[in-house]
Structures are given as C-alpha cells and as structure tokens.
C-alpha cells in the first residue's frame, strides 16, 4: 500500500529528501557569518628611548664577531674525534665474521649463521644406503633469533605417510562375524559415500562404529573424524532401516518466546524505577503513579502465570 494514494513511494521519498536538504541549506545560509580578521594596534615608541636602544644595539656584537672570537682549539678537537672514530671503525671491520671448521665425523660451516652435518656411516645398512641426520640452523647475531630446519631419515612409517599425503588411506571394516574387509577411501569422502560405495542398497541399514561411538552424522568426512591409515571401523547391518536426521530434528526445538515476555517486562519496569530514583525531576506525580500501577499489574500477571 502506497503512503500517498496515486503517488509511488519512490517519488514520495525523493521529494522528502529534497525538502530535507533544502531546509538544511536554508538553515545554514541564515546562520552563516563571516569571520573578521583581528585588528592589530601598533603602539608608537617614545622618542626618549631612541638613544638607549641605539646604545644597546651597538653594545651587542654581531654573529660574525661571535664566530670570529670562538675558541681556536675547537677545530683541533673535532679533527681528533673524527680520526679516533675512523680508527675504531677500521678495527671493528677487521674483526672476522665467519668461522669454518671441519671434523672427522661431519662438517660445520658458519657465515653469520651455522650449518651442522653429522654423518651416520656407522649406522648405515650393508648395501651402502644411509639415512643421515641433517640439521641446518641459521642465527641472526643482531636480533638474537634462531630458526632451524631439521631432516631425519624416514623409518617404517614411510608408506603410511606417503598414502596420507596422496589423499587416500586404507580402512578396515570389521563385521560381527570377525570378518574384515580392506577398503581404500579418500580423506574428503563422507560416511554416506562410503556406505553407498561399499554397501549399495543397504546404506540406510549399515551402521559404522569408530572407537565405541556410533557415527550418526553421515555428512562427516574421513579427515574430520581423524581416521588414519589402518583404522578399524566396526560395521553392523540392522534389519530395520534407520531414519537419517531424526536427532537433528529433535535438537532443533523452536524457542517459545512467550516464556520470555514476563522477564522482559520486569526488566523494563526495573529500568524505569531506576531512572525515577536517579532523575526524579523527569517524572511527575502522574507518571510515578502510572509506573506504580504498571508494576502491580506485571506482578499479578507473573504470579498467576507461575502459580499455574
């Protein structure tokens, strides 16, 4: 329904804005005043003080005279300070910043930092392959901070880590009759995808259990459940199909706003009484009487609702 019959709301809003800005402009023009520059009055100097000022002017030496009468030993002191600072800079520059050392077991090289290498020839297998421990560390002598990068040889978990890096892992599905089934899944696969892939037509009857907890949410992914390579999922195939999403529907209970009405009214009444005690000049006798009656009414409503 339009605000004015026969006229669109857009036209009404436009004219209201134009009228508002026109009122602002008229108010600004009517109250605008020009700022005047401050007036400076020059006080004439008395004639008697002319001679004294001239004598004082002749008494004070000029800047050139001050520079001429300066101490001649200042140039010598400045030149000696500059020579001493240059010698200290050369001595500091001659200090070595890099150290190189070699040992029989490994090597250490440092140039503003350090690189350490420790050989592991004694622990190498007979075929000649070795897994050295390699440590690289860089240090900042000025900031005092250090960062290190360490690399160590991989052990028996190389295959599992490579499989997880590739994004696929192997899961063991264990049934009630102690039979197992090895499946390959991706980290981004969901529980419903696993059920549909390996239990086609039975995804509503299959229940997966991991570490004693039933996986109810079929939208969870393998990575969110923190499943690793070789993890065991217990499978139970029930005779009755489970209805998905029942727990979620029960959890989303609508909020009853009617229960919050009485506490909200009590809060408003308390705020009004606080204002009445702090600022009594704002409340007349009639307003105070109405506030008291409203408080009694709210109290009666609250008592009757909670008494039932």
UniProtKB/Swiss-Prot annotation:
Residues 39-162 are annotated as: Disordered. The keyword Transmembrane applies. Keywords: Cytoplasm, Membrane, Nucleus, Transmembrane, Transmembrane helix. GO terms for biological process: ERAD pathway. It is found in: Membrane; Cytoplasm; Nucleus. SUPFAM superfamilies: Ubiquitin-like (SSF54236). The chain crosses the membrane at residues 11-31, 253-273, 283-303. Residues 63-93, 132-149 have a biased composition (Polar residues). It is a multi-pass membrane protein. Pfam families: ubiquitin (PF00240). This is Transmembrane and ubiquitin-like domain-containing protein 1.
């Amino acid at each position: 329904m339009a605000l004015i019959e026969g006229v669109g709301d857009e036209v009404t809003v436009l004219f209201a804005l134009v009228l508002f800005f026109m009122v602002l402009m008229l108010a600004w023009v009517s109250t605008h005043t020009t700022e005047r520059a401050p007036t400076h009055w020059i006080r004439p100097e008395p004639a008697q003080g002319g001679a004294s000022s001239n004598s004082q002017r002749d008494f004070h030496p000029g800047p050139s005279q001050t520079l001429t009468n300066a101490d001649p030993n200042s140039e010598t002191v400045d030149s000696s300070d500059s020579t001493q600072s240059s010698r200290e800079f050369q001595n500091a520059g001659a200090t070595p910043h890099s150290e190189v050392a070699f040992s029989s077991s490994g090597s250490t090289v440092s140039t503003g930092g350090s690189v350490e290498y420790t050989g592991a020839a004694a622990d190498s297998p007979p075929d000649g392959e070795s897994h050295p421990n390699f440590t690289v560390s860089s240090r900042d002598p000025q900031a005092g901070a250090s960062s290190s990068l360490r690399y160590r040889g991989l052990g028996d978990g190389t295959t599992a880590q490579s499989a997880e890096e590739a994004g696929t892992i192997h899961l063991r599905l264990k049934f009630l009759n102690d039979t197992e089934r090895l499946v390959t899944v991706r980290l981004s696969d969901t529980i419903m995808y696993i059920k549909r892939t390996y239990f086609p037509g039975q995804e509503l009857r299959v229940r997966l259990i991991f570490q004693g907890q039933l996986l109810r949410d079929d939208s969870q992914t393998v990575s969110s459940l923190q499943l690793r390579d070789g993890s065991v999922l217990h499978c139970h195939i029930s005779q009755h199909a489970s209805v998905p999403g029942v727990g979620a529907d029960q959890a989303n209970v609508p909020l009853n706003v009617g229960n919050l009405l009485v506490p909200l009214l009590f809060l408003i009444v308390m705020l009004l009484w606080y204002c009445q005690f702090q600022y009594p000049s704002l409340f007349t006798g009639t307003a105070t009487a109405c506030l008291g009656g409203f408080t009694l009414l709210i109290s009666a409503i609250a008592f009757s609702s909670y008494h039932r």
